[in-house]
Amino acid sequence: MIYGIGTDIVSLKRIIRLNKKFGQAFAGRILTPEELLEFPQAGKPVNYLAKRFAAKEAFAKAVGTGIRGAVSFRNIGIGHDALGKPEFFYGPALSKWLEEQGISRVSLSMSDEEDTVLAFVVAEK
């Protein structure tokens, strides 16, 4: 059963501006420790940041909380399965919160074009 859906669209120009203004502090605010290790090797660092920002915002919309409490940028991670499909991983506090809400699966789709990134999330009970 669908618990909620969320979508987010991010302008790459916005992420470029934020990254220039705040530098590593911006990445440190939105990326998990695991993502911070991957970030320097990303082929397109701005796209890497933008996709994760959009995915985490869409996640927060799908679960209905916004970014607050256990649903924080640093508790929501994005990785890929063996076939390259994007998937979420969670910090302990968020894992516990999802279990308490009865949310058993959260699916993610992301896409990017020249100047825009899109993330779409479906949370299921």
From Swiss-Prot:
GO terms for cellular component: cytoplasm. It comes from the Bacteria. SUPFAM superfamilies: 4'-phosphopantetheinyl transferase. Its cofactor is Mg(2+). InterPro entries: 4-PPantetheinyl_Trfase_dom (IPR008278), 4-PPantetheinyl_Trfase_dom_sf (IPR037143), ACPS (IPR002582), Ppantetheine-prot_Trfase_dom (IPR004568). Keywords: Cytoplasm, Fatty acid biosynthesis, Fatty acid metabolism, Lipid biosynthesis, Lipid metabolism, Magnesium, Metal-binding, Transferase. It catalyses: apo-[ACP] + CoA = holo-[ACP] + adenosine 3',5'-bisphosphate + H(+). Mg(2+) binds at residues 8, 57. GO terms for biological process: fatty acid biosynthetic process. Its main location: cytoplasm. GO terms for molecular function: holo-[acyl-carrier-protein] synthase activity; magnesium ion binding. HAMAP family: AcpS (MF_00101). Transfers the 4'-phosphopantetheine moiety from coenzyme A to a Ser of acyl-carrier-protein. This is Holo-[acyl-carrier-protein] synthase.
